[in-house]
Structure formats: structure tokens, C-alpha cells
Amino acid sequence: MRKVRRVLTGAGRALSPRQMRDENGLLVGWGLGTAVFPAVMFQGQARALLRRDRTGLVELGAQDMGQGAWTALAQIAADSLGLELEKLEFQSGSSDLPDAGIAGGSSHTATAGMAIHSAGAEVIAKLAELAMGDERSPLFGAGNAGVLARGGRLYRRDDESRGESYADILARAGFAEIEGRGSAGGDPFAQKPYAMYAHGAVFAEVKVDPELGQIRPTRLVGAFAAGTIINPRLVRSQYYGGMI
């Protein structure tokens, strides 16, 4: 509603047509359109690897048709492994890699992203198990308190002053790397007990020359609920492209 107020300012609009004009005599109209689209998740897989040299690798057969999917998926991959983006090697776009589902139906980020997240979570769980079971680790015995992964290190959730690097954990355990695999989605067409949709609204102000019939949109405002936004710049560009 805050978006509505920004557009529909003033003393209010007349309900009958052709009642509003601007200072140049052009007819002014206001309109509202709603948007709804199913939030679908298909089946997909991904593979993640954490190396002793403090780098990570994520592999999946996801496609990018120019919508910026690889950028968003690489961000999810780095976050799932608790690494900076520049420390991550992201491999995608090959049928030799794990099948990450189709790039369509506004489902790709959710499908491939969930597979990546699951693969990264498995890597971190294996790493945490090594540390929490090692008496030489400051994470020893963390147990139910658990750990969190950030910046190439694991920390105790109940005391973030206690932690150590991935490299130290792997070196002490004698591992060069740890691998995890993840999957996403079931049958997208199976009957579900609930529905998931992205939704939104677009508000428009349009001016019409009553003599020439020329139509010119002068203001557009969109408000959308599309779940967690991974890359705001990418999403903003897609919104602009769809509206304009």
C-alpha cells in the first residue's frame, strides 16, 4: 500500500472516465494490474568440494540463457560453503556435470540453488563432524550447540570466539578435500497440500492526447513478493524489463 500511495497522490481520482487532465490538456488515467506466477521447483543435483587450500568447487549442469542465473547460483554456492565468492570455482553448463534441472518456468534459481545449498550443507556437516570429534580442536564437543561457517572458518554458535579454519581441520584430519552432494525437488506436478506463488502488482499512470490518440505511459510502479532475493541488481533489471 505504501507503493500505491506514492503513485496515487493528490485529491483522488474521479470514477467516471475522461475526468482527469494535466496542465496541457492531456487525458490522465490510472490503472492497476496484478501479477501471480507459480513457484515451481523441479528435480536437480549438485556437487560441492572444499579443498585444504581454502578454495571451493561447485559443479552442476545448470544453464544460463542470459538471465544472470550463474551469478546468483555462484553466490548461493559461496554462501553454502561459507567462502568468499573469489575463493569459489563455479563449474556449470555441461551435460557431464550433475543434472540441475531445466532453465525455465521461473524455477531455475530455486531448483539449482536448493541443490547447491544441500551439497554445501553436507560438506559443512562433514567438516564439523571432524572438528567436533577431535580433542585438539577448539570446536571439540560443540554437540547440540552446533557450528556456523563463515569466511573459511567454523565457529561455535554459542561462542564465536572459539573457531578454526577449514584448512586446519582438514590438515589435522589428513584430508585434502571434502565432497558433498545435494538434490532438490520432487515431482513438480504431484498433488501438494498447499500452493506457492510469487505475486505482485503494477500501477500505471498513462496520458492520452484526445486529438491524436497518442498514448504515453508516464509513471510505472511495481511491487512484488518473489521470495528471497539472491541478487538485487539482477532482479531489479528483470522487473524493469518486464514492466517497460
Which residues make up each language-model segment?
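Cofactor-binding beta-sheet edge motifs in enzyme active sites
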Residues: 1-6, 10-244
